[in-house]
């Protein structure tokens, strides 16, 4: 070490004349590197060649060791770019600095920096000792095993010559060091107890050197995950990773791989758990990768590094004056950015241990005293200094399987089938040899985090929303404030990447663009699923979609319907030549480009549906004016080709009905009276909700309910001129009004009964799984539970006290053990919150109308003439009596349904603002004759027939006012929102 120092000092004097002639004669007063003991105690180390043991170690009776990984050193004092030494001199000098007298680092100085190292595969699939026995998946005839869907690096680049398949292993192992840089594994989680799988932990050694990217080569790139340098693995090491870039090995090597490596998960979509998880999913997970929210460094550097939630977010949790039902008190702005002075204040407040800690802890204890145990435990965990938003709790493959089993069959937020998504779209280039690998990795990272956020929020809690698990563990996302912070973080990170995406738009593949835009679709789905009003997310999503020119794809031709299997094979073969490139492959066929265009059109359709839902639910103006009737029919066609949404025809019908509901919502939001003053008489163009088969789908029943409610409102508003007149209600008018009310109540009852049968909590429940469909394959060693042994959620109440209530509705809902299960059993929907809230609002408006109308009809019976009138009156009274019976059942069903996650919604009739808005609407839209009441009330006019005619007119007048009040309230809901 001294010899190399004496050689480098004269060269430094020659190379850096600014340092002066005395630089060569100056001796260093301290060692170049402190020993481990001095570094730990942060004391001065006087270790040298002449003194093998420093003073501190000599006093403690220890020896100087240098086993810690050396940190990167900065430039020398007086360094300038003009005085930068040549590359060879800098390398030798850097090697001399890292030199020490320890035997551990004897070979470091002579080791070149460009040593060939190997690109590590996905480390979470490394088998562990003592794991579950290997399970061979049962695949469909001719199907290919699925590869790992995130960050699967390719083995080639567009400027490199593609080697043969037989020499693939040697080609990868013989690459130079610059091509063998890779990222740390992004998923360090163990197996989820939601599914019987064993995911292994990354057990290899940590990298000994961290190399940063060249600042001159990435000026326009983002500060994304740090590149890690790994050691060369032994030969055959890659055979343990079935989802790495080596999955393209020959068939013989793949068979050997299956014999030596343990398969960590089934490839099927429907796999019943080996043991009922009950309340134990997410019980014990290995530490996942943490969120980097509020970090001053790279937004995605080393995803496995922990980070704490900032105290500015915790303040809303610990405040006693915070309203738990309003999100504005928790997060007034959707995207807060902590500033450096705030961070310094937080550090200083965390360091103070004096008089502040005692009162603060006492206040927190008192504030949680009157709260339920589960809620206080959630807030205590969320507000603790060690709380953090940890992603990676669900393994990647299980995350995709949960989505396609519980979420996709009801509403395809990712509008593509499972095989195409996992085997094609998610296989993008993340190797550092690509100029856009950082962008690809960043987009995949937050796409995965957004999907996990959706799944974790949708998972059913054992004792209802916001309850603690049996082992005391609580998911931090059950906290309202933490959920809002997690949602805002995912949205902010994906928006921040948009300038870089526009800058590299010509270099990005269509796959990456689809994944990026699908992330916005997932975030808008989460907002609709929990019923949270955040118009900023939807507005920015529309802006991003317009920036990407997605509306231009609407004029392109659609993919041919006769999508044959042979043409797909030709398409895949043609795309295989440029399969790994991060740039758009110009050699693709026109049909392959049309396939991606179909995906972009579907994403645009889904965004229009979310826009329409938010417009109707919260009463905001519609942002996209594109009609959906013809666009949905063209874009979402049933097929079994590569670019289809769903290959099962029954599941596709459920998806289609959800899109039809989007058409009705779009029509209602565009046809508001506040926008168009004239009365709307036309019905939506697509009348598919009148189909008998559509009554078995909740979205179709909700669309039918909305149309019936709108038509009834229009009919009732036509009676507004008669409100203050002397005309009495006729029997025909009463019969028409009664028919509309009874039909609306019947639709409400059928819709709630169907929700109760399918999924009363609108949650992902392992005990209430969708039925096994055609094309789903399970493992031969796994015993599938019978349908009778896997009851729907309606028979498995979350609380024991509600068990009797659920048993009452077994016969009502037809939940017999041998009955065929519903095709949408166990699936979740983004419309359930809006359905339940709007039915509760309408119930408050119409629940007294049947009784009032029956009273009027009974009073009119003595005055009726003819036997026909008597029969019609009896039938009318009978239908109104049945409606009253259904109202009682509707009230019970609403009390049993628990779709609310973390936000509660107050009835519109109980809001003070609703009464004011209804009064203003009546003043604006009511006829002039109604605004000016008549001088002589109709109730005081003498009756021509008998003494009881005055009482009859009074009852009719009361019914008239009740009907018109309900009509104005219904109009207020349509104009200003349901929630």
From Swiss-Prot:
It is found in: Nucleus; Cytoplasm. GO terms for cellular component: cytoplasm; nucleus. Residues 1-47, 65-142, 165-219, 249-380, 563-590, 926-954 are annotated as: Disordered. Its main location: nucleus. Residues 1-14, 36-47, 105-114, 280-295 have a biased composition (Basic and acidic residues). Residues 35-64 bind DNA. Residues 358-368 have a biased composition (Basic residues). Keywords: Activator, Cytoplasm, DNA-binding, Metal-binding, Nucleus, Repressor, Transcription, Transcription regulation, Zinc. It comes from the Eukaryota. The keyword GTP-binding does not apply. One of its GO terms (molecular function) is DNA binding. Residues 170-179, 186-207, 310-329 have a biased composition (Polar residues). Residues 565-574 have a biased composition (Acidic residues). Residues 132-142, 251-263, 296-309, 369-380, 942-953 have a biased composition (Low complexity). Pfam families: Zn_clus (PF00172). The keyword Protein transport does not apply. Belongs to the EDS1/RGT1 family. Glucose-responsive transcription factor that regulates expression of several glucose transporter (HXT) genes in response to glucose. In the absence of glucose, it functions as a transcriptional repressor, whereas high concentrations of glucose cause it to function as a transcriptional activator. In cells growing on low levels of glucose, has a neutral role, neither repressing nor activating transcription. PANTHER family: GLUCOSE TRANSPORT TRANSCRIPTION REGULATOR RGT1-RELATED (PTHR31668:SF26), GLUCOSE TRANSPORT TRANSCRIPTION REGULATOR RGT1-RELATED-RELATED (PTHR31668). This is Glucose transport transcription regulator RGT1. The gene is RGT1.
């Amino acid at each position: 070490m001294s010899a190399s120092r004496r050689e480098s000092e004269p060269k430094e004097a020659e190379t850096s004349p600014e340092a002066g002639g005395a630089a060569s004669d100056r001796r260093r007063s301290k060692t170049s590197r402190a020993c481990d003991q001095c570094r730990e105690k942060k004391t001065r180390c006087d270790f040298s060649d002449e003194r093998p043991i420093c003073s501190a170690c000599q006093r403690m009776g220890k020896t100087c060791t240098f086993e810690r990984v050396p940190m990167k050193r900065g430039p020398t004092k007086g360094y300038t770019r003009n005085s930068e030494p040549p590359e060879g001199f800098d390398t030798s000098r850097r090697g001399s600095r890292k030199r020490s007298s320890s035997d551990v680092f004897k070979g470091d100085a002579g080791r070149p920096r460009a040593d060939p190292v190997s690109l590590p595969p996905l480390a979470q699939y490394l088998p562990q000792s003592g794991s579950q026995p290997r399970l061979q998946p049962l695949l469909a005839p001719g199907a290919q095993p699925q590869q790992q869907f995130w960050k699967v690096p390719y083995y080639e680049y567009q400027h490199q010559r593609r080697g043969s398949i037989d020499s693939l292993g040697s080609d990868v192992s013989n690459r130079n060091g610059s091509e063998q840089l890779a990222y740390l594994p992004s998923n360090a989680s163990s197996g989820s107890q939601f599914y019987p799988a064993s995911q292994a932990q990354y057990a290899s050694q940590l990298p000994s050197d961290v190399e940063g990217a060249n600042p001159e080569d990435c000026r326009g790139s983002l500060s994304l995950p740090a590149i890690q340098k790994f050691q060369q693995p032994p030969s055959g090491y890659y055979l343990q990773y079935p989802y790495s870039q080596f999955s393209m090995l020959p068939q013989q090597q793949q068979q050997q791989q299956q014999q030596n490596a343990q398969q960590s998960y089934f490839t099927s979509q429907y796999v019943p758990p080996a043991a009922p998880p009950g309340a134990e999913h997410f019980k014990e997970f290995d530490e996942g990768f943490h969120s980097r929210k509020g970090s001053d460094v790279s937004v995605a550097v080393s995803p496995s590094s922990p980070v704490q939630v900032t105290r500015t977010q915790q303040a809303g949790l610990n405040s006693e004056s915070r309203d738990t039902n309003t999100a504005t008190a928790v997060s007034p702005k959707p995207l807060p950015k902590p500033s450096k002075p705030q961070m310094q204040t937080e550090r200083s407040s965390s360091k103070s241990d004096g008089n502040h800690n005692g009162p603060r802890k006492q206040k927190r204890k008192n504030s949680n005293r009157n709260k339920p145990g589960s809620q206080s435990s959630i807030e205590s965990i969320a507000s603790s200094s060690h709380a953090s938003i940890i992603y990676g709790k669900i393994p990647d493959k299980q995350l995709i399987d949960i989505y396609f089993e519980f979420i996709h069959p009801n509403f395809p937020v990712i509008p593509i089938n499972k095989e195409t998504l996992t085997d094609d779209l998610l296989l993008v280039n993340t190797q550092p040899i690509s100029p856009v690998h950082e962008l690809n990795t960043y987009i995949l990272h937050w796409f995965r985090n957004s999907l996990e956020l959706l799944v974790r929020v949708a998972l059913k809690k054992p004792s209802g929303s916001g309850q603690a698990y049996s082992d005391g563990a609580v998911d931090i996302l059950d906290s309202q404030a933490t959920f809002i912070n997690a949602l805002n973080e995912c949205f902010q990170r994906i928006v921040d990447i948009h300038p870089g995406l526009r800058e590299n738009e010509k270099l990005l593949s269509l796959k990456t663009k689809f994944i990026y835009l699908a992330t916005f679709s997932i975030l808008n789905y989460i907002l609709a699923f929990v019923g949270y009003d955040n118009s900023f997310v939807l507005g920015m999503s529309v802006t991003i979609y317009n920036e990407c020119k997605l509306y231009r794809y609407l004029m392109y031709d659609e993919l041919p319907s006769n999508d044959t299997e042979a043409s797909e094979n030709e398409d895949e073969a043609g795309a295989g030549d440029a399969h790994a490139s991060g740039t758009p492959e110009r050699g693709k066929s026109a049909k392959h480009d049309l396939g991606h265009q179909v995906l972009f059109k579907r994403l645009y359709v889904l965004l229009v549906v979310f826009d329409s839902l938010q417009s109707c639910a919260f009463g905001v103006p519609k942002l996209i004016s594109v009609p959906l009737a013809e666009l949905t029919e063209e874009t979402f066609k049933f097929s079994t080709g590569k670019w289809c949404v769903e290959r099962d025809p029954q599941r596709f019908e459920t998806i289609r009905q959800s899109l039809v509901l989007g058409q009705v919502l779009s029509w209602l939001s565009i046809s508001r009276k506040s926008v168009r003053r004239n009365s709307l008489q036309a019905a939506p163009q697509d009348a598919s909700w009148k189909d008998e088969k559509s009554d078995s789908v909740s979205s179709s029943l909700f669309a039918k309910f909305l149309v019936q409610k709108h038509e009834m409102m229009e009919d009732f508003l036509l009676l507004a001129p008669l409100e203050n007149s002397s005309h009495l209600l006729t029997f025909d008018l009463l019969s028409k009004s009664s028919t509309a009310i009874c039909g609306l109540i019947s639709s409400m009852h059928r819709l709630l009964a169907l929700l109760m049968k399918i999924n009363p909590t609108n949650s992902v429940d392992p005990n209430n799984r969708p039925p096994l469909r055609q094309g789903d394959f399970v493992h031969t060693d796994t015993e599938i539970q019978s349908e009778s042994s896997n009851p729907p959620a309606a028979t498995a109440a979350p609380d024991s006290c509600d068990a009797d209530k659920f048993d009452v509705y077994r016969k009502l809902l037809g939940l017999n053990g041998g009955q065929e299960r519903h095709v949408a059993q166990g699936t979740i929907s983004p419309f359930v919150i809006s359905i339940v809230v709007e039915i509760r609002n309408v119930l408050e408006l119409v629940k007294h109308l049947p009784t009032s109308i029956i009273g009027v009809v009974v009073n009119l019976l003595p005055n009726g003439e003819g036997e026909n009138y008597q029969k019609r009156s009896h039938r009318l009274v009978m239908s109104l009596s049945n409606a009253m019976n259904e109202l009682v059942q509707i009230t019970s069903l609403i009390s049993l349904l628990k779709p609310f996650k973390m936000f509660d919604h107050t009835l519109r009739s109980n809001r003070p603002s609703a009464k004011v808005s209804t009064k203003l609407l009546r003043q604006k839209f009511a006829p002039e004759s109604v605004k000016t009441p008549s001088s002589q009330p109709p109730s005081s006019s003498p009756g021509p027939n008998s003494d009881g005619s005055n009482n009859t007119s009074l009852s009719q007048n009361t019914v008239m006012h009740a009907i018109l009040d309900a009509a104005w309230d219904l109009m207020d809901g349509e104009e200003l929102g349901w929630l």
